[in-house]
Amino acid sequence: MRTEYCGQLRLSHVGQQVTLCGWVNRRRDLGSLIFIDMRDREGIVQVFFDPDRADALKLASELRNEFCIQVTGTVRARDAKNVNADMATGEIEVLASSLTIINRADSLPLDANHVNTEEARLKYRYLDLRRPEMAQRLKTRAKITSLVRRFMDDHGFLDIETPMLTKATPEGARDYLVPSRVHKGKFYALPQSPQLFKQLLMMSGFDRYYQIVKCFRDEDLRADRQPEFTQIDVEISFMTALQVREVMEALVRHLWLEVKGVDLGDFPVMTFAEAERRYGSDKPDLRNPMELVDVADLLKSVEFAVFAGPANDPKGRVAALRVPGGAQLSRKQIDDYGNFVKIYGAKGLAYIKVNERAKGLDGINSPVAKFLTADIVDAILERTGAQDGDMIFFGADNKKVVADALGALRLKLGKDLSLTDEDKWAPLWVIDFPMFEDDGEGGLTAMHHPFTAPRDMTASELKTAPEEAVANAYDMVINGYEVGGGSVRIHNGEMQQTVFGILGINEQEQREKFGFLLDALKYGTPPHAGLAFGLDRLTMLLTGTDNIRDVIAFPKTTAAACLMTEAPSFANQAALTELGIQVVKKAENN
């Protein structure tokens, strides 16, 4: 039906007869001439109808936005004065000789000339996806997956599928459960990741595995989370953590070079402890120049309990955040930032405005100045590198609250004051995470997952001091987004059972949930490691959007619903009966 795509026509096509298929993007009726912008997935081209082709001109008068049409015509060069430099096809146009209206369009629920609500866009997603910017994002996503497959094939990886219907395992989020009709009362789980299957593939001798795979997590959603998402999943045998990072870094550098024309260079490496200390986050955005600076040692003797208390507490921390040019902030803005940090557990936000540094105590403005000596102020200004016109904010509390509050404030200030370089790419690796963290109930939980190996510890050493264990894990971070994470896996049965025990999984539960894994570990398991990238998040970064729903063809809302198909929906009673399921309605409060 077509010979060319609209958006691919260029000066090289001048004089050729072409047949195009697509949609009316815009129509302009000048009486004796009718112009339309005709659109398909590749872009837009201008088509015009003149009186010499009367039948086509008459039919063109009926055209409206989003009519699906076929046009045959001749490509012509535009006059120099009519060239549109903003269009890829702006040097040419098509003189139509025939027009077929394939399908007409009703009055549109989406307005191409206005900003539509996300609710409307998701409800009429098939119309939303016709927009050039949406089509371009999905084309970029397709290019990324193609580049990944070629790279992995070139590096000896095998694309192997793993099951979608599997067994529930504890991986940090709730599972989506699928009832079995054959095995009444039993349920499959949709995989949160192919973690155990890819480890079993290593045990099976397939030493380089990858898969672009759907995963499912029943968790609370954010702008960059979906209940079903796509991973670039990788596992490798007989490689160290460093070697795995080198291969995966090469993949990401390849993607950025091919998609953006940007050489990311070598990725810096930072420990978890350093990232938390300097940036208040384990996924620091290095485009932002501000850093947290420890000042507790300078404030231990001040007569101000808000500072002195945490400064003298081994579990406490007092840190400063210097904001270049921040002295311009108004009292209201400072109060707003004080309320902002309370979201993260902080009780308030002390500050020093640096007016004239050379004047020391007399050159600052601060509600806590009366508690500080000139020497302490000078030391704080020196350590933070403060200059005239800067602002210094303080966090004083337990270590987690200070990191969370000042880390979030750092990001917000970077955006609000345009301190973050939006034109820069800042990748890094974060390594050496704690293996376990407090679950809030007196126990421990795995910071990554229970199949991550510790660094340089035996099973007996781990059992003795689990709080001191460092995971042989690594996250790739780009511009403050964790785009991928992985680890060296446990390949020893004793170590795996030790980790399960630390996590409170008794031997009976270990056999019930992981018996197949523990058995497999008995038969010559190779050392192996892996990583998984979030394809959705990578695409989000490479297309310049901050909403993950913009890079998924048919995403869910933040309430995990599809507005277009109205999923989830109630099941047919006959189907429920066959599955042995009874839906219990929640009692309404009187």
Curated annotation (Swiss-Prot):
Homodimer. The gene is aspS. It comes from the Bacteria. ATP binds at residues 217-219, 226, 482, 534-537. NCBIfam families: aspS_bact, PRK00476.1. GO terms for cellular component: cytoplasm. Keywords: Aminoacyl-tRNA synthetase, ATP-binding, Cytoplasm, Ligase, Nucleotide-binding, Protein biosynthesis. Its EC number is 6.1.1.12. One of its GO terms (biological process) is aspartyl-tRNA aminoacylation. This is Aspartate--tRNA ligase. It is found in: Cytoplasm. GO terms for molecular function: aspartate-tRNA ligase activity; ATP binding; nucleic acid binding. Pfam families: GAD (PF02938), tRNA-synt_2 (PF00152), tRNA_anti-codon (PF01336). Residues 195-198 are annotated as: Aspartate. Catalyzes the attachment of L-aspartate to tRNA(Asp) in a two-step reaction: L-aspartate is first activated by ATP to form Asp-AMP and then transferred to the acceptor end of tRNA(Asp). Belongs to the class-II aminoacyl-tRNA synthetase family. Type 1 subfamily. L-aspartate binds at residues 171, 217, 448, 489. It catalyses: tRNA(Asp) + L-aspartate + ATP = L-aspartyl-tRNA(Asp) + AMP + diphosphate. The lineage of its organism: Bacteria, Pseudomonadati, Pseudomonadota, Gammaproteobacteria, Enterobacterales.
